[in-house]
């Protein structure tokens, strides 16, 4: 399940919902269980988008030289930032907002949920904007030690997530819709496609290295293609 947060894998809440609905599929279920741990669900939070304090950036090439917040334990994020000529700066969930407010980073990837307590223009700057292009998906994976619970407990919890997948993802959609429209900035289809290609190249490197689970990456690509057949890795787009 850790691969669900992989760069460029889950582009929206619909794909996250479709993944949740498959948690009790026999082929998938056996991959969620090992001797010591069992993945029983994921709480969707929403897509992580670039938050920046300037309106002068609208193209990938303009990211060169920018300081972008990344998680220290996430090498693919760091590689992606370096690939556009930007500088990765280590942050964590407890200090990312403070680093952004104190101008220690120029760009902060974040889910909208993390921005809702703030007035973006007042707390971050008058030109603050959110790029309407998902870098990754943010969710809270629920992992248990199966030996500490009754038999089939994990399956029952996964069944709950399957049954409530629409409710859970609707909540994430509501959070994203809560952000006023004037903060969102769209990028061109050409820019999105260029960035998708770059993200996929780096992601596939980490699949080959074993950092990402190849099975789940392929599964999520198939789910993405169902939702967006135009995505360049989908058969219909070729």
UniProtKB/Swiss-Prot annotation:
GO terms for biological process: response to antibiotic. This is Probable solute-binding protein AdeT2. The lineage of its organism: Bacteria, Pseudomonadati, Pseudomonadota, Gammaproteobacteria, Moraxellales. Keywords: Antibiotic resistance, Transport. Belongs to the bacterial solute-binding protein 7 family. It comes from the Bacteria. The keyword Transport applies. SUPFAM superfamilies: Periplasmic binding protein-like II. Mediates antimicrobial resistance via active efflux. Contributes to resistance to antibiotics such as chloramphenicol, erythromycin and novobiocin. May be part of a tripartite ATP-independent periplasmic (TRAP) transport system.
């Amino acid at each position: 399940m850790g691969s669900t947060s992989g760069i460029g894998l889950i582009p929206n809440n619909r794909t996250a919902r479709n993944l949740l609905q498959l948690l009790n599929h026999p082929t998938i279920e056996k991959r969620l269980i090992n001797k010591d741990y069992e993945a029983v669900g994921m709480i969707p939070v929403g897509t992580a988008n670039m938050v920046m304090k300037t309106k002068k950036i609208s193209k990938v090439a303009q990211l060169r030289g920018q300081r972008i917040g990344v998680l220290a334990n996430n090498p693919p994020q760091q590689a992606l930032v370096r690939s556009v000529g930007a500088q990765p700066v280590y942050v964590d969930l407890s200090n990312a907002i403070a680093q952004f407010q104190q101008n220690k980073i120029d760009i902060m990837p974040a889910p909208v949920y993390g921005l809702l307590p703030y007035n973006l223009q007042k707390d971050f700057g008058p030109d603050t904007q959110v790029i309407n292009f998902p870098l990754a998906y943010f969710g809270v994976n629920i992992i248990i030690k199966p030996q500490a619970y009754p038999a089939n407990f994990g399956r029952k919890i996964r069944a709950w997530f399957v049954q409530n997948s629409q409710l859970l993802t609707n909540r994430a959609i509501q959070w994203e819709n809560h952000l006023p429209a004037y903060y969102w900035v769209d990028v061109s289809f050409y820019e999105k496609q260029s960035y998708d290609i770059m993200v996929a190249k780096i992601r596939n490197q980490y699949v080959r290295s074993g950092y990402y689970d190849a099975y789940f990456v392929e599964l999520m690509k198939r789910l993405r293609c169902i939702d967006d057949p135009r995505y360049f890795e989908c058969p219909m787009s070729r």
